[in-house]
Amino acid sequence: MDPRSGEERTFSLVCDMGPGSFGALWAHVCPCELDALALSHCHADHMGDIISLQVYRKWGPGAAASALPLYGPAETLRRVRQIENAPDDEAYEVEFAFTHMQLGEAYQVGPMTIRPYRALHPVEAYGLRIEGPSEQDPERLVSLFYTGDTDLCDTIIEGARGVDVFLSEVGFTSDENEPDMHMDGTRAGEVATRAGVGRMIATHIQPWTPRDRVASEVRQTWSGPLDFATSGMQVIL
């Protein structure tokens, strides 16, 4: 339910917009109907398709009447300009309303609440805890934590504490991993266990990495439900 109008409708929040995601988005919602976009960080593999969204919202049929709330790190506007090769005075005020996410703050998107938690990555980066009413029982609060890109750290464990779904990056295997950048399966599983999550979904897996290798590492530290994110996958809470 829309907390402002009291009307029942579906709210749509997108977390990150890497290459190819804008095209895939159409299978789920028209881009003009988005309620907000949240960026975990500003590396290109997590925001490269934002210019496709920008072009649509400015020039496309049914372009939005108001700017889309865009939550992200301090450098978000600068990075959007870089991707488009736009001048320094381009504000994208027709397309986006930029908000620099602050630790300890909560951001409302309809009935959903977004809370950022500091991630351990070479740039300003956040894990995102999202809470809102259950699809099946609107009186019940459900939660998801998306790690973005991070290595294991206390703030990510704190953000994931007790969530129903833990959407975790598993960027590399234990043989490949660089510290303070990504998690391997063992460390991602450790976060899931220490945070006491209900279900883990592994994502951000490299195309050359076999799933059974990831599962084997995760199972060293996590014994709960484990799935792998796939294109078009739906999880109903």
Per-segment meaning from a language model:
Residues 151-236:
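Cap/insert and terminal regions of metallo-dependent hydrolase folds
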Residues 1-146, 151, 156-158, 215-237:
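Binuclear metal-dependent hydrolase catalytic cores
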